[in-house]
Amino acid sequence: MKKIAFIAFLMAVCVATGRAQESRQDISISGSGLIEPFVASSTNIQVHSNTGYGLLASYRFMLTPSSALEANYGITYHNKIHYYGNPFNFQVLTRNQEISAAYVRTFNFRKFNPFVEAGPGVMIFMPIANSSTWVMGAKQQTNIGGMYGAGIAYEISPSFDIRAEYRGFVTKVPNFGNPGNYKLDTNKYYNIYNPVLGVAYHF
């Protein structure tokens, strides 16, 4: 009886290991921060914002054991973008959405799996019309850009790992359609910092 139980246990371990090796897809959910840098431009418009917080959902399909394609959707709330000019000073409360795709290169070291990634995407800036937006007529804006990142995944089981990553998104500074006849153009691109921490499930 003990031998049968032991053999059954070994078979279960082998099946789990085999499934882990055959896993070619994973999904992950992460908490994220959105940090937009200070921007000074030749148009005399200065832009600054607070840190926004949100979620990032990702899907990866493994092409080989060390390379994958990834699709991302992220949303961030309560990101206040401040515009300083002469003679105005106001802010726009925004909800940001990221839609992007990337090529991922993974380096396998037992349970630790560092990775790098890069690809195209869009950042959608959606103004929220409430008391935190100080100008009327701000319009939704969709800007094309590119994302990149580097991080590490730590395997906690054959099916799950913890992922930490520094991501960046390069896109044009929004002007929200120059609301209220104010010229908010900076003619600048900026690098939005986006650290994330989450859990991935392999299947």
Features from the language model and the residues they span:
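Cleavable N-terminal export/targeting peptides
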Residues: 1-24
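Alpha-helical transmembrane segments
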Residues: 4-8, 146, 193
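Gram-negative (and chloroplast) outer-membrane scaffold detector with strong preference
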Residues: 22, 31, 58-132, 154, ...
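Surface-exposed strand-loop-strand hairpins of Gram-negative outer-membrane beta-barrel proteins
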Residues: 33-56, 141-142
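Outer-membrane beta-barrel translocator domains and adjoining extracellular loop/strand segments
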Residues: 39-46, 81-88, 126-135, 175-182
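Short sequence motifs at beta-strands and strand-loop junctions characteristic
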Residues: 47-52, 93-98, 140-145, 187-191
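Predominantly the C-terminal beta-signal and adjacent terminal strand-loop region
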Residues: 78-82, 157-203
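A charged, solvent-exposed segment within the mature domains of Sec-exported extracytoplasmic proteins
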Residues: 125-168
